[in-house]
């Protein structure tokens, strides 16, 4: 409240500045005192001239203030004397010099990811599904060990009478000597040389030096087979897997009764045998041999069906002819291609045109003469006609 009173007092002093004589200049002293002791500057108030509104708003001088008069109201104020004694008044510190120490509250931020609690898993003992030691199972004796002895009458006698059968078939057969129709040592068969080993050399007139191409005949049966590397699909070392012992290693011991009961079969055959009839043995007919044996080799059947020698011969000749004809056909195609290329190159050049025409004629003649012999060879190598010359296959 004292602060508010002091401020009200200051406002009254400022308001009375207009009515106080200017010689005292109280407001200036107050302003300087406030500024000196408290550091406060009061605002300067400008009072408008309400009586002379048309006058310029210039600050009046000291002489002008002396001459101002108030015609409308004459106020005679007694002279006011101020005795100002300034004392050092200890005012409370409105603005504190040292800021108070503000203790901020410590805020504990909760853990967003809390630590998981340690859960103690209880140890569960799993019972043995299959016990290691199986119990011994005692099988009840279905068949009793001590069976009663039942005596059955003897229908069949213990000792049968011996019956002697006469020897109808003689034991010692007469030895019959058969002549050697098929000789032990077969004769050597010479196959005629239809294909000559050395072919005749055909001399071609050297009209143009020709280098014939070297034709490699393919091997019918390859000597060296290609090595094929098979990738190791199956690993060399297989992983070892341990199979769990589902079935126990030691099987249970089962006691089986060792005593087997003796069962007596009744004698179905009667004791007294009746007189049996005559026993008929089968008659065996031996093959009758001719009285006059042939001196020469036997004549084979006209048809060679079922003859093993003929079958082998025909198969071998058939395979050889097919292989040989394939080789001849390949050689013919390659030779024809080479000669046609040579003749076309000669005929295309005008300088060697005459030689080219001769080449075409020569090509036709030589191909016909060479391969006519091969065609005749094909006819001679028919399996049936060729195998007729082989003995034992006529």
From Swiss-Prot:
Occurrences of domain Saposin B-type (ranges): 306-394
Keywords: Disulfide bond, Glycoprotein, Signal
Disulfide cysteine pairs (residue numbers): 310-393, 313-387, 343-359
Carbohydrate-modified residues: 25, 272
Signal peptide (residue range): 1-18
UniProt feature coiled coil, ranges: none
TM segment ranges: none
Entry protein name: Saposin-like protein 11
């Amino acid at each position: 409240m004292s602060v508010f009173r002091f401020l009200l007092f200051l406002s009254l002093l400022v308001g009375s500045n207009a009515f106080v004589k200017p010689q005292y200049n109280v407001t200036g002293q107050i302003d300087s005192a406030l500024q000196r002791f408290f550091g406060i500057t009061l605002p300067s108030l400008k009072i408008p001239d309400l009586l002379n509104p048309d006058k310029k708003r210039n600050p009046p001088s000291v002489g002008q203030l002396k001459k101002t008069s108030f015609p409308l109201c004459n106020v005679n104020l007694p002279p006011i004397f101020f005795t100002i004694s300034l004392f050092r008044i200890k005012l409370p510190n409105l603005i504190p010099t040292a800021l108070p120490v503000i203790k901020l509250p410590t805020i504990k931020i909760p853990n967003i990811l809390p630590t998981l609690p340690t859960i103690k898993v209880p140890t569960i003992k799993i019972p043995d599904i299959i016990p290691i030691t199986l119990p011994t199972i005692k099988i009840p004796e279905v068949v009793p060990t001590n069976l009663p002895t039942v005596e059955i009458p003897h229908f069949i006698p213990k000792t049968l009478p011996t019956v002697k059968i006469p020897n109808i078939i003689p034991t010692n057969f007469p030895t019959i000597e058969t002549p050697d129709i098929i000789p032990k040592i077969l004769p050597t068969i010479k196959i005629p040389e239809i294909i000559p080993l050395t072919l005749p050399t055909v001399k071609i007139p050297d009209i143009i030096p020709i280098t014939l191409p070297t034709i490699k005949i393919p091997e019918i049966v390859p000597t060296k087979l290609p090595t094929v590397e098979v990738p190791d699909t199956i690993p060399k070392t297989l992983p070892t897997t341990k199979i769990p012992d589902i079935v126990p290693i030691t099987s249970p011991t089962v006691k089986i009764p060792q005593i087997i009961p003796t069962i007596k079969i009744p004698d179905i055959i009667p004791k007294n045998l009746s007189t049996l009839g005559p026993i008929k043995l089968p008659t065996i007919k031996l093959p009758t041999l001719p009285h006059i044996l042939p001196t020469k080799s036997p004549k084979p059947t006209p048809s060679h069906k079922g003859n093993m020698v003929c079958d082998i011969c025909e198969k071998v000749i058939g395979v050889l002819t097919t292989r040989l004809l394939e080789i001849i056909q390949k050689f013919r195609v390659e030779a024809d291609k080479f000669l046609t290329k040579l003749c076309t190159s000669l005929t295309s050049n005008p300088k060697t045109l005459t030689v080219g025409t001769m080449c075409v004629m020569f090509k036709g003649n030589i191909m016909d003469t060479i391969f006519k012999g091969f065609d005749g060879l094909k006819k001679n190598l028919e399996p049936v006609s060729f195998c007729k010359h082989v003995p034992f296959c006529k």
